[in-house]
Amino acid sequence: MDKLAYVHAQWDDEANVWVASSDDVPGLVTEAPTTEELITRLKVMIPELMALNSESPAGPVPFELLTRRFEMTA
């Protein structure tokens, strides 16, 4: 896969985790308490899911993590 995979993550305030999914990587849904942990999981899951979907990458898979979190002022 030479194209960039876009991964969207939104903060789940009730569960206190980032929830991520991607239209570019079928089956990708994961969560983690920090964006750093989320990135670590994505680096493993993206190539695994691509292989399961018969889209084995020739090398590293580039991805962009887009985060969204809503907050309120005090």
Place the predicted regions along the sequence by residue.
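Short aromatic-glycine-(Arg/Gly/Cys) micro-motifs in beta-strand/loop hairpins
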Residues: 10-23
